[in-house]
Amino acid sequence: MRAVIQRVRHAGVDVDARTTGAIEQGLMVLVGVAPDDTQTRADKMLHKLLGLRVFSDEAGKMNLNVQQVEGGLLLVPQFTLMANTTKGLRPGFDGAAPPAHGEALFDYLVAQARHAWPYVATGEFGADMQVSLLNDGPVTFIVET
């Protein structure tokens, strides 16, 4: 499982001109699922997302996690994160999970996140989404489990 994590002032996802998810301060996370990913890897990813200390404390040091700042978590499925770009100019997507597996694991991640934290919003698996955000910093990390 691969995630691009961005600290944001606010972020949202629209599908067909309707908002499917939006947060204020928090983390906007693009999530890619590999064919061999498991619920255990999704659990590890959630642990990292909730615990990653990327928000500033009173001294201005990145020392607080999303829960400590009562921030939101916007989870957006994105199979293109798993693309292979090492050969040629056309990305290959063999590294992405088949849709049924990818959706099941993304849904599992979302369910676990909602169980652990009340401020969770999502994009829509398989949809053409428009994602907007105000990146804070910018602070961006790539995490793999």
UniProtKB/Swiss-Prot annotation:
* Gene Ontology process terms (BP): D-amino acid catabolic process
* Residue numbers covered by motif Gly-cisPro motif, important for rejection of L-amino acids: 137-138
Where in or outside the cell it occurs: the entry states:
Cytoplasm
- Predominantly, its location class is cytoplasm
MF terms per GO, please?
A: D-tyrosyl-tRNA(Tyr) deacylase activity; Gly-tRNA(Ala) deacylase activity; Ser(Gly)-tRNA(Ala) hydrolase activity; tRNA binding
Q: What is known of its domains?
A: A Gly-cisPro motif from one monomer fits into the active site of the other monomer to allow specific chiral rejection of L-amino acids.
**Similarity comment:** Belongs to the DTD family.
The UniProt subunit note reads as follows: Homodimer.
As for what it does, the entry says:
An aminoacyl-tRNA editing enzyme that deacylates mischarged D-aminoacyl-tRNAs. Also deacylates mischarged glycyl-tRNA(Ala), protecting cells against glycine mischarging by AlaRS. Acts via tRNA-based rather than protein-based catalysis; rejects L-amino acids rather than detecting D-amino acids in the active site. By recycling D-aminoacyl-tRNA to D-amino acids and free tRNA molecules, this enzyme counteracts the toxicity associated with the formation of D-aminoacyl-tRNA entities in vivo and helps enforce protein L-homochirality.
Name used for this protein in its record? D-aminoacyl-tRNA deacylase
Q: What is the organism lineage in this UniProt record?
A: Bacteria, Pseudomonadati, Pseudomonadota, Gammaproteobacteria, Oceanospirillales
